């Protein structure tokens, strides 16, 4: 974390004419008024927490405002999504449950993308604040363990959360390596129907996917809104 954090600070300094950190909503409004893009520091995978609450406090002080509970492996918070039903059913570990209340108090977002189904439902049960799935799609449309079921979408919407649609083809279309706007729209419409229009977001994962994309970067995203 420390190495990546230093890289982050250097990027902010090198691009300070167009980029500024945001710790809260007021910062976002201030940056927008100044004509700058807001950068919100996030952490994907709770491994760096190492089961220590003081690490969570440290991350918050450094500006982290969102943590994805897991990536592809078990950690001190809980378990990842898995093709193994026994793993998928596992809920959060005691430290994972403890972090929910503290993150709620601090105003840190919990991200459930990559989390086991059991862990997801623990978040629903115990979180008093909205949470998000930063880069996930709909399991009803593409049966992948990384995607959310209709019940999950409904629960997330009820909590006031957001689903960032992932542009990776394996989460949009089974058996295809192509990502097209029509597939993205299909998942957008399903999320709208099951979670509500306020739950719609984009979680492209451009830096982590190898799909054949109809557009290659953020410059092409207005085409989705025009479709």
Where does each model-flagged region fall?
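Short, surface-exposed alpha-helical recognition segments that flank or form part
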Residues: 94, 111, 179
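Active-site glycine-rich loop that binds ribose-phosphate moieties when present
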Residues: 89-98
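Glycine-enriched alpha-helix->loop->beta-strand junction motifs that scaffold or abut catalytic
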Residues: 64-66, 105-108, 126-132, 158-162
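Substrate-binding cleft of carbohydrate-active enzyme catalytic domains
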Residues: 98-112, 116-123, 150-158
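Short loop/helix-cap segments at secondary-structure boundaries that form the rim of catalytic
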Residues: 59, 123-126
């Amino acid at each position: 974390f420390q190495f990546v954090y230093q890289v982050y600070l250097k990027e902010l300094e090198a691009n300070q004419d167009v980029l500024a950190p945001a710790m809260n909503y007021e910062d976002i409004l201030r940056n927008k008024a100044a004509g700058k893009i807001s950068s919100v520091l996030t952490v994907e995978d709770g491994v760096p927490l190492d089961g220590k609450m003081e690490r969570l406090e440290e991350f918050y002080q450094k500006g982290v405002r969102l943590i994805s509970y897991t990536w592809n492996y078990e950690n001190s918070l809980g378990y990842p999504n898995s093709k193994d039903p026994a793993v998928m059913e596992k809920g959060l570990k005691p430290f994972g449950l403890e972090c929910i209340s503290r993150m709620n108090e601090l105003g840190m977002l919990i991200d459930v993308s990559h989390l086991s189904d059991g862990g997801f439902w623990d978040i629903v049960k115990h979180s008093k604040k909205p949470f998000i799935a930063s880069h996930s799609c709909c399991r009803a449309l593409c049966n992948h363990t990384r995607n959310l079921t209709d019940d999950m979408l409904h629960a997330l919407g009820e909590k006031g959360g957001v689903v960032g649609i992932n542009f990776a083809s394996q989460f949009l279309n089974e058996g295809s390596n192509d990502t097209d706007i029509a597939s993205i729209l299909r998942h957008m419409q399903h999320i709208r129907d099951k979670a509500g229009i306020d739950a719609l977001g984009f979680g492209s994962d451009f830096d982590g996917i190898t799909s054949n994309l109809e557009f290659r970067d953020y410059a092409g995203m207005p085409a989705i809104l025009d479709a």
